[in-house]
């Protein structure tokens, strides 16, 4: 069973009427999902293409000058320097191969290259699967700086999972902030998840240990472990995350099965720095990029997944539970370039 199978409603828990309603909702989902994503990425799209329109205004062919301006457009859209250079070099290669390229083609060519980069980072599959063993909880350790939306992401994810009929345990292992524990408690109650907590200042690894023991004993399907996000002491952070991982592996061999880094997309280049520091501190296996609806900095999705070669699992495009969206690279590119129905 893969991670995404966890979101399928268990057959023995769904009444026929509920199943019919679920089927009706799913038939409406593709168009509605795309519309919501289009709206969520509108600021990024309008920012990118208004800059692009200005860059090619009055020009008919793609030459060195146009590519220089395109490079500036991508960098100021927070795609990142390394990824921007890669895109420009690929477009240069296409122009050299084709001998001639007009500016009217630039929109579709840029779309192709961004889609290609995302495919390289995510693989050819629509969703990347994970090897989840039957009979034991699937453990996700969630990392990220304070304020990135880590606690809210855990809460929304728990709500989605419990709504799909899964038993969810949450470990409040960010024991340095009372507010984080209290906020998680509210989300756990709202989602119908079980939360394991200790007093503020307790050993985070001890919280993780207790959470996994309880989850295993009670037949939980998924465990979500919150962690502290203090980057001012990277060595301390690395040691703490390593200790948590080692303790969890003693309870459930192979745990955590996923380490999810939550990044605030609205911070632009700061998100790159956070990704760099956390990937140095621990092995990160997936990304969640939040707050994309209120920013023109959505290019970070492209740049970070390309630079760090870590798949994006979720993006946040609003406050609602359903606006924490499983990332679909084709939907993302369609929304960014104003195309639907493909």
Range-by-range predicted roles:
Residues 1-128, 133-141, 163, 168, ...:
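Non-catalytic terminal/linker segments enriched in charged/polar, low-complexity residues
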Residues 82, 111-342:
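P-loop/Walker A NTP-binding module and the surrounding RecA-like catalytic core of P-loop NTPases
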